[in-house]
């Protein structure tokens, strides 16, 4: 199954799981127009971040690509320092410097492997991490942070799923079907655990701690 289709099903099953919980708790699902636009902005960043990641896998080995994705704590810190005036310590500066050097070595430039494809992959993966960092930094400053975490996460992933569906339709012309029972089970678990549960708890964390701390802790799990 193509990775874009996997993402769509992942978000779809995650939304179904969250919708079931919302219906169980009889949560009011109405959205004000302003809140809809704010959620759509977050969904767009999340969807484009996901697209950049899966496209980046076409240009680099999956291990290197995943490592580059985890540049997002560095992006989160830099955005917080520049725009939110967070204090930048010497230790943090050294950590950022080491991370930048690591990305430089992973790009393959020193080995003579810095081809256009490799640089394209590097750009896509750093873009993915950057957009995820922007998502984490701006959310705590938005009015929708007062919305129940489960409801907010549902709408973010619902609109992201629609964006990915449009992307798959225009780029591939179709969404791959689920062929086997094992695929169905795996996709459901993928939607439940690393999508629904993980991102609801992320939203809850961003309401309690700084974006930088959430990004650093998130990189360890």
Task: Indicate residue ranges for each PLM-predicted region.
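Hydrophobic transmembrane alpha-helices of multi-pass small-molecule transport proteins
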Residues: 18, 40, 46, 79, ...
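Membrane-interface helix-cap regions at the ends of transmembrane helices
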Residues: 13-32, 101-115, 159-183
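Specific transmembrane alpha-helical segments of multi-pass solute transporters/efflux pumps
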Residues: 25-69, 105, 190-209
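Specific alpha-helical transmembrane segments that line the substrate/conduction pathway
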Residues: 5-16, 46, 54-87, 92, ...
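Loop-to-transmembrane alpha-helix entry segments
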Residues: 33-34, 69, 85-105, 115-122, ...
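Transmembrane alpha-helical segments that form core, pore/gating elements
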Residues: 3, 15-18, 76-78, 114-172
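Helix-helix packing/entry segments at the starts of transmembrane helices
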Residues: 8-9, 65-71, 138-161, 195-221
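Hydrophobic/small/kink-forming positions within alpha-helical transmembrane segments
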Residues: 12, 19, 43, 47-51, ...
């Amino acid at each position: 199954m193509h990775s874009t289709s996997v993402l769509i099903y992942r978000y779809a099953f995650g939304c179904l799981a969250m919708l079931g919980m919302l219906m169980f708790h009889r949560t009011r699902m109405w959205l004000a127009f302003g809140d809809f636009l704010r959620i759509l902005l977050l969904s767009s960043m999340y969807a484009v971040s996901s697209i950049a990641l899966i496209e980046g896998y076409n240009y680099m080995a999956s291990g290197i690509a995943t490592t580059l994705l985890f540049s997002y704590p560095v992006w989160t810190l830099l955005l917080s320092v520049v725009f939110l005036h967070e204090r930048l310590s010497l230790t943090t500066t050294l950590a950022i410097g080491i991370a930048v050097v690591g990305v430089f070595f992973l790009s393959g430039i020193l080995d003579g492997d810095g081809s256009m494809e490799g640089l394209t992959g590097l750009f896509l993966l750093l873009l993915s991490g950057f957009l995820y960092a922007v998502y984490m930094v701006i959310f705590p400053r938005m009015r929708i942070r007062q919305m129940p975490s489960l409801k907010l996460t549902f709408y973010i992933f619902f609109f992201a799923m629609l964006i990915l569906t449009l992307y798959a339709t225009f780029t591939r012309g179709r969404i791959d079907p689920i062929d086997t029972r094992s695929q169905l089970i795996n996709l459901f678990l993928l939607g439940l655990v690393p999508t629904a549960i993980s991102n609801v708890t992320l939203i809850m964390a961003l309401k309690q701690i700084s974006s930088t701390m959430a990004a650093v802790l998130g990189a360890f799990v």
